[in-house]
């Protein structure tokens, strides 16, 4: 689960981090009034969506004219913002953040993730703020400095000072950076973050550190113990198909290919996508129906997959472990009849009663192609998607 920038900054403020005074607004009139409450003669207005690249897409504006704030809000509220991180439809804009403008002398980067290699929370800092950290990591990895947080001792001030020296901070900024670092590290654990970024963390013209942006990703598995954070969820930012799939305990992620995939087990699903790609196809989705591939869940899975107009063929790859393959085959047949599938369906069954399952499919009279192996299934579904 992701948070909006205004929500992230609200948490930053609770932990004593320096953020701009700002208000999240639902209407153009609220945005104009917010500028008046903030005061000054220069403001920043930002579309609130769960995606980066807002500035290049026109979703951020610096202005000293309240009527321009009104026009910006009237234009964007209710529309979708398309950036390089969204699909072609973009993300809906329901709120506009109005903030005081900050005079910037320099831009830094500060972020943290859960690193699986070290099994620790790892902080990353760089002098290359304001740009994509992935690009920095690829082109100039030596400019990224790290601090690994020991879960036994927690964050330590010396780690902040070490990063601060590498960023070239002066003594006053070092104290500010240490406070920011300690606050973020505590916040990360308190609220079960999976990702945290301040990009950029700026040095103002007065020489002070300031959190100019905020990006937070929450570990979805921990939401049961984070009621306050869970209440911040904005369902409008979720993919409609992914949200619908979650209601039926289906793990679905939309992609941009034309081969629909329905698999039981996340590992097998990723392997299936890889082999489809290997044989020249492009997966249209990741979909894990889980261990209980019942007729009802398979039917919903088909509906979700086929709601994507790009899907030209569907590959069903099921390993029958807990559930027998003949029962799964009957569920697939029932689902195909119920949904009225109009595209080719390739089914690969393996495991308990796999041969019996293939016989059930063959006798169904439906246009279902039974594959003998995963390679065979991938080749068949790619050809079917190409109309061959």
UniProtKB/Swiss-Prot annotation:
Catalytic activity annotation: succinate + ATP + CoA = succinyl-CoA + ADP + phosphate; GTP + succinate + CoA = succinyl-CoA + GDP + phosphate
GO biological process: succinyl-CoA metabolic process; tricarboxylic acid cycle
Any one GO molecular-function label of the UniProt entry: ATP binding
This protein's record includes keyword 4Fe-4S: no
Details of cofactor binding: Binds 1 Mg(2+) ion per subunit.
A single GO cellular-component term on record: cytosol
Organism superkingdom: Bacteria
Domain spans labelled ATP-grasp: 9-244
Keywords (A to Z) from UniProt: ATP-binding, Ligase, Magnesium, Metal-binding, Nucleotide-binding, Tricarboxylic acid cycle
Cofactor: Mg(2+)
Annotated residues for binding of substrate: 264, 321-323
Binding site for Mg(2+): 199, 213
Record-listed ATP binding positions: 46, 53-55, 99, 102, 107
Subunit details: Heterotetramer of two alpha and two beta subunits.
Function as written in the Swiss-Prot or TrEMBL entry: Succinyl-CoA synthetase functions in the citric acid cycle (TCA), coupling the hydrolysis of succinyl-CoA to the synthesis of either ATP or GTP and thus represents the only step of substrate-level phosphorylation in the TCA. The beta subunit provides nucleotide specificity of the enzyme and binds the substrate succinate, while the binding sites for coenzyme A and phosphate are found in the alpha subunit.
Entry's family note: Belongs to the succinate/malate CoA ligase beta subunit family.
Name of the protein: Succinate--CoA ligase [ADP-forming] subunit beta
Organism: Shewanella oneidensis (strain ATCC 700550 / JCM 31522 / CIP 106686 / LMG 19005 / NCIMB 14063 / MR-1)
Gene name of the encoded protein: sucC
